[in-house]
Amino acid sequence: KGSQQTADKVNHYFREIETPTKQLTPFEGIRAMKDLKLLSAWLQMTKLGQYTRIYNALLGLIKLDLKTCSVKDLESVHGIGPKTARFIIMHSRPNQRLATLDTHILRWMRDQGIDTPKATPQSQKLYKELEDKFLTLCDESAILPSQLDLKIWKQYSK
């Protein structure tokens, strides 16, 4: 019964966030859930696992301003690496020139004749080299990185 009440509170809260009168950024939504003591319950409902690690990462994220934070700011949060930092910025500020080098992007780049690893590179140097190649492909196609990322994801995630 208690977990159902918590689930009902979390679901009610999200319905409130989605109303046109409340335009919260994702970070503001996470901040509000923390303030309402619903963040842990929401994480449990997602069934993602690793709740403590994710909870602590979210606490680090909500200290930042999503509209102005840099990749470096995001990477300073324990648990946030280059791919996630770029994903957050690229999809919250679509005009950013960044690449989220996930398996779909890397596979697409291989299909374009570029030698890439199968998994996101852990080396900052290699990540930057591949990001630059991806951005060049965006320029050649006259498409924003966020738009190409979404297009590739739709095509390769099937």
PLM regions and their residue ranges:
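Alpha-helical ds-nucleic-acid-binding substructure associated with the helix-hairpin-helix region
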Residues: N11-H78
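C-terminal accessory module of base-excision DNA glycosylases/AP lyases that mediates lesion recognition
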Residues: Q50-I62, K67-C69, S76-K158
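A short secondary-structure junction motif
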Residues: K1-D8
